UniProtKB/Swiss-Prot annotation:
Protein name as it appears in the record: Transcription initiation factor TFIID subunit 1b
Chain residue ranges for the region called Disordered: 54-83, 350-372, 1303-1382, 1397-1471, 1596-1634
Family named by the database record: Belongs to the TAF1 family.
Domain of life: Eukaryota
PROSITE patterns membership: BROMODOMAIN_1, BROMODOMAIN_2, UBIQUITIN_2
Subunit: Component of the TFIID complex. TFIID is composed of TATA binding protein (TBP) and a number of TBP-associated factors (TAFs) whose MWs range from 14-217 kDa.
Amino acid sequence: MICRVDYGSNDEEYDGPELQVVTEEDHLLPKREYLSAAFALSGLNSRASVFDDEDYDEQGGQEKEHVPVEKSFDSEEREPVVLKEEKPVKHEKEASILGNKNQMDTGDVQEELVVGLSEATLDEKRVTPLPTLYLEDDGMVILQFSEIFAIQEPQKKRQKREIRCITYRDKYISMDISELIEDDEEVLLKSHGRIDTHGKKTDQIQLDVPLPIRERSQLVKSGIVRDTTSESREFTKLGRDSCIMGELLKQDLKDDNSSLCQSQLTMEVFPLDQQEWEHLILWEISPQFSANCCEGFKSGLESAGIMVQVRASNSVTEQESLNVMNSGGQTQGDNNNMLEPFFVNPLESFGSRGSQSTNESTNKSRHHPQLLRLESQWDEDHYRENGDAGRENLKQLNSDARGRLSGLALQDRDMWDESWLDSIIWESDKDLSRSKLIFDLQDEQMIFEVPNNKERKYLQLHAGSRIVSRSSKSKDGSFQEGCGSNSGWQFNISNDKFYMNGKSAQKLQGNAKKSTVHSLRVFHSAPAIKLQTMKIKLSNKERANFHRPKALWYPHDNELAIKQQKILPTQGSMTIVVKSLGGKGSLLTVGREESVSSLKAKASRKLDFKETEAVKMFYMGKELEDEKSLAEQNVQPNSLVHLLRTKVHLWPWAQKLPGENKSLRPPGAFKKKSDLSNQDGHVFLMEYCEERPLMLSNAGMGANLCTYYQKSSPEDQHGNLLRNQSDTLGSVIILEHGNKSPFLGEVHGGCSQSSVETNMYKAPVFPHRLQSTDYLLVRSAKGKLSLRRINKIVAVGQQEPRMEIMSPASKNLHAYLVNRMMAYVYREFKHRDRIAADELSFSFSNISDATVRKYMQVCSDLERDANGKACWSKKRKFDKIPLGLNTLVAPEDVCSYESMLAGLFRLKHLGITRFTLPASISTALAQLPDERIAAASHIARELQITPWNLSSSFVTCATQGRENIERLEITGVGDPSGRGLGFSYVRVAPKSSAASEHKKKKAAACRGVPTVTGTDADPRRLSMEAAREVLLKFNVPDEIIAKQTQRHRTAMIRKISSEQAASGGKVGPTTVGMFSRSQRMSFLQLQQQAREMCHEIWDRQRLSLSACDDDGNESENEANSDLDSFVGDLEDLLDAEDGGEGEESNKSMNEKLDGVKGLKMRRWPSQVEKDEEIEDEAAEYVELCRLLMQDENDKKKKKLKDVGEGIGSFPPPRSNFEPFIDKKYIATEPDASFLIVNESTVKHTKNVDKATSKSPKDKQVKEIGTPICQMKKILKENQKVFMGKKTARANFVCGACGQHGHMKTNKHCPKYRRNTESQPESMDMKKSTGKPSSSDLSGEVWLTPIDNKKPAPKSATKISVNEATKVGDSTSKTPGSSDVAAVSEIDSGTKLTSRKLKISSKAKPKASKVESDSPFHSLMPAYSRERGESELHNPSVSGQLLPSTETDQAASSRYTTSVPQPSLSIDKDQAESCRPHRVIWPPTGKEHSQKKLVIKRLKEITDHDSGSLEETPQFESRKTKRMAELADFQRQQRLRLSENFLDWGPKDDRKWRKEQDISTELHREGKVRRAYDDSTVSEERSEIAESRRYREVIRSEREEEKRRKAKQKKKLQRGILENYPPRRNDGISSESGQNINSLCVSDFERNRTEYAPQPKRRKKGQVGLANILESIVDTLRVKEVNVSYLFLKPVTKKEAPNYLEIVKCPMDLSTIRDKVRRMEYRDRQQFRHDVWQIKFNAHLYNDGRNLSIPPLADELLVKCDRLLDEYRDELKEAEKGIVDSSDSLR
């Protein structure tokens, strides 16, 4: 029965049986409208409802005796509290509790009730039916319970309530409480009704009466409440979120009384929704009450619907309930201090049932919905009890009780039966402890939602349960539910499956059948998610052995490291790198006299092996002896020693699994890289049947093993048995009878198939029996060998890809590279603030510099460190690393990228470098002639079976359903087995158009070859006799033919022809194929045919890879033979490793093998493979340098200077590195030693063009600042072919010489200011035609084959200075042309060929052309800031001659290009002026273009005051000798630059690299520097290089001149003819005219003092002085930058505001340089005075201010004096020339 009570008004109502159920809306009403939660909690305390908010079973404080209690219960004679009444009770009528005049508050009503129970009832000695309340003073009756139950008809409502709660019964009925209650809580619900309580002397009876309570009212206590100590008042409470129901589950209740457990198990308590409690309501059938009922109880308690519960408790106060203590109801007892439990059921009559029925009905009514509503509204803060306030309220209650309760009416008198006392539930004096709610994050069945913060990221990585966030979404944007529908939120709490229409449900069900529920979630380890186990860049060896990684079992010597080990610093102790075969290296410092045993002892600490363990050390392929010292065995400093460990350790406990508290699978397991080890856990070996699987997982990536079982019938339960078997692979997935197979093949009914599934692919696996002798050998990075058992071994079938592999030059590839770079940068920024720019360029070489800058500007700034190297510095504001860093690049994307690299590497070795779309391949093949179709078909086949094409084809067809598998070839070129055991994922070529078909038929008809379609040969046109002859050819008997008509003969011919053509018969003019007809099939027939083909291939693959039954019956001989073959293969591999990779080692090894084993064939590596090995060795050497150059102290203290030292793993700059280059790449001919052709190996690789933007200062000077830059430069020159871009200067045409690329005012023009009378004939490209041709404008270079049939030597020798002199002497005698040969490597495949440059007096265009892809190479000597000296690339010719890679061009090995050379019979001035300067532009070929050749004229610096040289043969010899010297010097410089890509400049020149950053650093400090102008710095460097170079030339020339003068004993007068600008038509003169002109010039030179007019002289001495002083200034600015950096530029006002006020004559080096260029200095003293002025100004301004600056100025003047003294002779001659010039002018 449910009653609604409104205590806010004086009227109550009773709604009858059609009551409304309490809902959650009731809780939102004001507190004054409803009954307080105190009564509800008091009534439900013993029941521990599921919805209870407080825990009342906790143990209270120690109970004390209560003094006011004088009476106790008697065991024999006991006075019941409730009296019995015989009058009938009517339940339909209700009376008012309060009158309209006087409304009492909660405290008043409570006081009156307490007094009644305390004073009146316990004085009576006889049993009364129901209790009666009396006044304490006069004993007047206040309330009788009999009157409460006497009202039979409900009264109408007197006034409207303020707020009425509307409840809905249906809603409550729909709530199934059984779903909220688990099985283990059911016992508790049935047993918590009875709790025994032990009381010592005073057991209180509490009457819990809910009354209206106002916000600030206080509870009144009387009797025992008044004298209760503070200890008894304390009561342990739980929070609102606690659940009392679960308390007994913790087994914390300690009770010695066994009756408690018995009472809990005997009682039956059912939830409210499981019992029909409405049938238990009594309507007008209550029994009669006795006449002895007291008349005192006249209260409206029953009309208010109050459930009265009387219970005994040792606690005094409960803050959540109103306790009414009855001290008078206690009786004395001799041996029993405990009251029997009893319970009052206010919903039915007390006399209608016995004790058992009463208990049952009481327990059934305990879960009253009204009580649930009332208990949630309790607020304990409003019901604090106060003793003093209680006494005052009690007095007020006693005085006004009669008037306040006079309006109460009697309603019911059903409490006479004392059987209800047996139902009283007594509270225990021991409290139950608080239950602990445990959230297990490792429970995989749990799902927790956490906010988007840092804790979510941590929990997702470490928790075994699922951690989700409301704002997060899965990668595909949706969350798949088990019902197959996508909900708006992840948990799909809206039950969308019940609201779907039929069509959508059927569609989703169909899609679910296609995928058949088998998508398991794959977890990766934390290192794999962070990409810690994956390399950023794969080496060539790793790409070549991508599918079969090659382990190193024999020490391999690095040739590059061997060549460089002597060059590295060797002072002090000797450093040695000890490296294990596992790849771990360690740097050790030892003495040269130490033994190998000492070295092993030191290495044992680093490589974790015991000193007693037997290990071997190898150096240069030889094993080192322990007793001898390192010096005796010729171990050089900075060398690499390999450590070989031979002891095998056993792991008997490797099978153990982690403990119970540790997770066995990600993300809870494998959180560190050290966890990814074979030291523990189970090991499965899987071998792929494919030679090159499409995709492979990296270390740390997860995979799911599962077994699919196909039901043979709907009743088949064998799949459940598989789940219980221990030998089943992975989880078992049962396929229903109608489900489709998850593989291309069909899984037969009643059979199972295991598979391995990842996010990338799915492949079937076939278990094999593991031999007892099979073990796994594990080698660690430090070389330790261990042996452990293997759990299982399986063979993996063909992969079915689930994702597409990246294709080259696609948007996905670009996005991946950018994301990979940013993920790397973000992770690096977590640990450091700077990343070297070279590091990103080297690690991500496929990304252009512009792209790198674009994305790096978001989080960093490009700066320069203290060493002047560019680096990316993290922005200060960029402190937040993106939360989705782990999802930026998925591990599957890395595997896809690596698979693409492996495919590209294979195509590269096949010679395929250009790619096209698969759709255009068939179109291209149709247009090729027949003789080229075979080669083109091979290329097309290789392009079709690339990983990206195969995966794309399969994924496209599979996503549309297995029904579309007919779009694949299934059989053909894509079969990885090559013999019908695998599927071909090549997509079927689209049908050709009708026009192409018609063209093919027409072409076939022209060739006389019939087609198979039958359209060209119609048997219906045959006559009877012709048809008879055809049938006779078909071996049809003549008797049968004679009986047939023409129509029958035609049908027979067509039938037999079609059958034989379908069976593979030949097609020809005389065969039956000419009459065949193709059979057309429907789409369903094609699907069925494809399905049958898949089943056949699947069955063959399954039988081939499954373990045979007779594997265990293998004989020992067969096993031994397999072992012998394995040993033989292993020996061959070791021999190959021992033989080395170089040519010499191969030759020596072959000689040994020939002598021992006879003829042995060995595959010689191709040139591409050699280049790849060189590149890998260079990368290994970089790592070796990192170990050699690192400082151990800095490493320990972690104070490495900067990341700008390379990649962070690259060595710092060194000044004494010797260049390295393979000798076979540089070769010169003896007759042309001064012409060095820049050669490189052109390899067919895919071009990844990088849009590099360089500053103006980098356009002329190419800086090699770090080892990465040098290695990148060499790799670019040796491996990649770049397209040269024609500059705007190429459109210029010189008006003097007619050449392209410059104007006539350019000082590099051959005819710049040249004397017109002595001008030789100009060599230009328009010489043969008279005007520039189109080929000239396009920059084509014409090459002429040399008629010399003598082959050029394969290995050319170097030229010395003496040989060059001889060549010069021999060539000086003939004025004709000379042939100059140079070697260039032509990469058309892998063949090395040579080219010749023919230097002649005129150009001859020929038919052969040279094309180039290389960038523009300036052949002018460039200054290298690393070397600090000029690099004379070539005084005349430099560049590359790279012919095209066509087969016919590769066959020819010699070409010549016409390069002008001056006649050697003219004098020095003519020879100087005729020095060639040409720009030979590359051709504009479409496919193959070669490098550009730039031939620039060297700058002329001569002394005009010396006498003119005589035109003698000795001068020509001297000129040639000088050119040879320059060539030899240039060759040495180029060797230093090209032999070693780790070329570091000298110590002093490293300061030049710092110059770029000097201005920036000084600007930051606010001192006296500022940035250089880029263009000015570039000009300075070029001028410095030229001045230094020509100074050496002039010095050598003068020394030769002095020796010649001593021999001839006569003086030579030096002079220079004035050069006048030539006319435009000078270059068109004929050769005969040129000879005459030369003769005239020679005569004129001999007699010029007599006949020639006085020419206009230049300031020859002043120019020489200016050149020398400028070189001194440049030396001070560049070489001595550590001294002069403060005096480079004028002091600005910003740097020193009062500088000009103190210093009246400011001076700086830039001002001095400008004065030198304006030729303002007449002698050296003026120059020195200005430098002294700098010193004076520094002392004048900085003395007393900046004490560190004046010493620098003093040192600057000292260095200037030293330089002036060094150039003393030259300055003296120049000053003398100035004096002579001034004298002559006077």
